[in-house]
Amino acid sequence: MYYPEPIARLIESFSKLPGIGQKTATRLAFYTIGMEDQDVNEFAKNLLSAKRDLRFCSICGNLTESDPCAICTDPTRDRTTILVVEESKDVLAMEKIREYRGLYHVLHGTISPMNGISPDEINVKSLITRLMDSEVKEVIIATNATSDGEATAMYLARMIKPAGIKVTRLARGLAVGSDIEYADEVTLSKAVENRLEI
């Protein structure tokens, strides 16, 4: 189908986003074209601002405006527990339940032998280093219930247990193959409460 070049470029840009196919990208492009100039400018400004102003915390790897992040510097957090997640959006999901008061570590992915992603390509080394110099007594592994999430959890458990640190996994109120990001707050709360030792 023929579209003027500016619309075609916009459709292509939207289609690069995860979960956005050609049809949705086309719908978003035409919606954006129909928006008021002020709203388009605000959208563009917010997008550029987020890209420019956010960075990864040098301690936990979470997205933040300041380094270290607000969670790592919060003196009221339980420093004896670290909850390990795949992505920053998982931290947000866990914070919503207001049950967990420890620290976090964001891996930025999972080990995936099928996709050629090794432990060196995710944020594992800094976790191990962090554990060696800390008062951490428990690491809760909260990777997604997928084959890659399970492989990552087992690898982390093998790396951490020799240090004498308790390693637990979120309980299975989460369906196999599901992402933490999409779990409801009650399910997440119960998964943390009933976590299992690995």
From Swiss-Prot:
GO molecular function, one term: DNA binding
Cleavable signal peptide: none
UniProt keyword terms in alphabetical order: DNA damage, DNA recombination, DNA repair, Metal-binding, Zinc, Zinc-finger
Zn-finger (C4-type) residues: 57-72
UniProt entry tagged with the keyword DNA repair: yes
Toprim domain location: 80-175
A single GO BP: DNA repair
Any Pfam family hit: RecR_C
Organism superkingdom: Bacteria
Job of this protein: May play a role in DNA repair. It seems to be involved in an RecBC-independent recombinational process of DNA repair. It may act with RecF and RecO.
NCBIfam families given in the database record: recR
Record family assignment: Belongs to the RecR family.
Name under which the protein is recorded: Recombination protein RecR
Organism: Lactococcus lactis subsp. cremoris (strain MG1363)
Lineage of the species this protein comes from: Bacteria, Bacillati, Bacillota, Bacilli, Lactobacillales
Gene, per the UniProt record: recR
